[in-house]
Amino acid sequence: MEISQQVNGLLNEAIKTQASDLYFLPEGDEYLVKIRNANEVVVWDKIGYLQARRMMNYCKYIADMALSEQRRPQIGSMDWHFGDNQYFLRLSSVGNFTGLESLVIRIIYRLDDVHAAFFDEKQVQLISEMSRKRGLIVFSGPTGSGKTTTIYNLVNQMVSDQFVMTIEDPIEIREPRFLQLQVNHDAGMDYTDLIKVGLRHRPDVFIVGEIRDAMTAEAAIKAALSGHLVYTTVHAQDPVGVIDRLKQLGISDEFIAQALTGVAYQRLIPTTDGKQRAMLMGHGYSELVNMNTYDWGEWQDGLKTAVKAKLVTPETAQRFEFG
């Protein structure tokens, strides 16, 4: 089988499983081919060095990356067609300390191809109702917990005739109806700069990929205070931690109270059918402001309900009882 056919087959199989990433990773004198599905990374295959080298070179060639460079970091991208659908692939390569190259391929899906299943749709509705108030809605949860997918689906359901602008690093989902901007530090386009540009475009809704620093936090707060609906994510262990994180980034209690409409916490939890569902919990700012420690009671009740419905095992519920 030709190398092109091997790569095509591998990528198409990854897309069938809705994998987010495909990895070529050196291990001894072999390469591991791995795929990431939500929170789980599994070994797809083991291949020899020469076969891996040929497959990686083919990928790099069609992504317009330098074949001769195997140690320094490189990035590339390409469109990929499978069936009637088009996908966007983002490639990243780098060599390890022995000079063996690794390659990661991120698969960017269209919003129409990404579907989120929830344990409790009432929580989704709660956050949707919060969105009518405008202001800042912050999602928290570990990397790979489906936050961006949920945000995109929420916004897509409510904005049939509104102007939506996204600012991300990098773009994770393709949606042609949104104006999507990507952070580019080399070009002097960081989150803060793009939010300022975005305000001049006067969108109805902002999606800011992540608040990572004080300047981005301040810019997102200003956008929310100026009458926009702003969705974003923050790294925090629980919903109360979101408020603490904003304070750590220099946002005053007064501005948080004025701008923060709601907070959501989400995890993707394995189900008994071998798939995953999102456990989502939403809170208005007033529910959280006086909490010193987050009360996981409602979350744990949701897990108990899922166990009774035989959607998750008791062992899985115990593993996720504190988020």
Residue ranges and their predicted role:
Residues 1-323:
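Short, flexible helix-loop junctions that flank or precede catalytic/ligand sites
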